[in-house]
């Protein structure tokens, strides 16, 4: 049986400073697809220079945007990455082994986060199991605009090898990112008729980070 062809899909918005390393780490894939939502920093041009197929799509929210990318891919097996993530060499080896003889339709991998130059391999933050490799005929992204997840019609297997995640390099960048996420979460709660205290929205990400 021949190996299953793989598409790596990445959604982007002004990610030029991070994307090149991500694309280089995914160069083993049969296709790399970048779905961009109107970047103004040369992200789309950079992706094309690295051999990626680039599609423009207005922002739909994280879940729907990622599912659009999955459906636009040319292959059924997809690996979903963020622009600030890298496929480590051990993970690449395991992915290729899985594609040679898939035993499941979806695979989670350990994600290792780096904050301010330090890899966080202790506490709650590691291994941050992330379901990113799957056969799109048996799995899809949820429609959630934030805190999206992959929904499958079968069991999820695990593979070794770190997915490397470069988080914000500065505390200011980290807090800015958390502010954007909590704003989106607050809007979702409001639309659902729920209320969350300001203290909870502000402290939850900080308390979680303190456990790393």
Placement of each model-derived feature along the sequence:
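N-terminal/domain-start alpha-helical segments
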Residues: 1, 15, 29-30, 45, ...
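N-proximal low-complexity "stem/linker" segments adjacent to membrane-targeting elements
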Residues: 1-25
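Short beta-strand/loop segment that forms part of the nucleotide-sugar
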Residues: 10, 29-38, 55, 83
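Acidic helix N-cap motif at the loop->helix transition within catalytic regions
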Residues: 20, 41-50, 90-91
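A conserved acidic beta->alpha catalytic loop
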Residues: 25, 36-46, 82
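Conserved donor nucleotide-binding strand/loop of the catalytic core
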Residues: 44-72
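Catalytic-site signature of metal-activated, phosphate-bearing donor transferases
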Residues: 63, 67-70, 76-77, 81, ...
């Amino acid at each position: 049986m021949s190996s299953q062809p793989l598409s790596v899909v990445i959604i982007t918005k002004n990610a030029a400073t991070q994307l090149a390393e991500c694309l280089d780490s995914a160069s083993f894939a049969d296709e790399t697809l970048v779905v961009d939502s109107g970047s103004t920093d040369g992200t789309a041009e950079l992706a094309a220079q690295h051999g990626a197929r680039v599609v423009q799509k207005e922002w739909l929210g994280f879940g729907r945007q990622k599912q659009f990318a999955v459906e636009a891919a040319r292959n059924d097996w997809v690996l979903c990455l963020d622009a600030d993530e890298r496929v480590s060499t051990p993970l690449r080896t395991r992915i290729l082994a899985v594609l040679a003889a898939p035993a499941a339709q979806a695979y989670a991998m350990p994600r290792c986060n780096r904050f301010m130059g330090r890899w966080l391999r202790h506490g709650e933050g590691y291994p941050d199991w992330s379901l990113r490799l799957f056969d799109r005929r048996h799995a899809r992204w949820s429609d959630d605009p934030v805190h999206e997840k992959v929904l499958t019609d079968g069991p999820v297997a695990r593979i070794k090898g770190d997915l490397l995640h470069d988080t914000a390099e500065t505390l200011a960048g980290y807090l800015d990112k958390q502010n954007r996420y909590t704003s989106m979460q607050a809007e979702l709660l409001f639309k659902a008729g729920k209320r969350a205290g300001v203290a909870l929205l502000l402290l939850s990400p900080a308390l979680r980070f303190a456990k790393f």
